[in-house]
């Protein structure tokens, strides 16, 4: 009977995590080069890449993330709304995407003022319909 080698498994896990971080850094560099005028900020946190875009560029960036051969973020996981009552740009939407092909996740966020209408992404991700309605119900954000 072979004993479970915990040290070896731990080393494999660390190697996997290092590879994942390296891939996220490459993706971050790629996105910043391809979408340089559209990305306001990007950072890697909790093994996920977060990019911030202006709400006017939201649909174009999401279409790129889904259709680009190096990205392949073809699954929308969720849309979350955030309310910052004291900020000028009071609301933030955070879109969570998954690429099965690349085994990676990305968060895309956009901030905007109260009463701004945000472009819907239901033509790109039909499943966004339900999520956008939930955001409207909770925050009054219109799409």
Annotate each language-model stretch with its function.
Residues 1-143:
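Terminal low-complexity/charged segments
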């Amino acid at each position: 009977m072979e004993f479970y080698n915990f040290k070896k498994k731990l080393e494999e896990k660390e190697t996997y995590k290092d590879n994942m971080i390296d891939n996220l850094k490459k993706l971050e560099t790629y996105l910043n080069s391809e979408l340089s005028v559209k990305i306001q900020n990007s950072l890697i946190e909790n093994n996920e890449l977060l990019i911030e875009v202006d709400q006017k560029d939201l649909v174009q960036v999401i279409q790129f993330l889904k259709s680009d051969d190096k990205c392949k973020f073809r699954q929308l996981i969720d849309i979350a709304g955030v309310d910052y009552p004291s900020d000028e740009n009071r609301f933030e939407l955070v879109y969570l995407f998954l690429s099965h092909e690349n085994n990676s996740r990305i968060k895309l966020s956009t901030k905007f003022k109260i009463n701004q209408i945000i472009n819907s992404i239901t033509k790109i991700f039909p499943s966004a319909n339900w999520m956008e309605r939930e955001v409207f119900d909770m925050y009054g954000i219109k799409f």
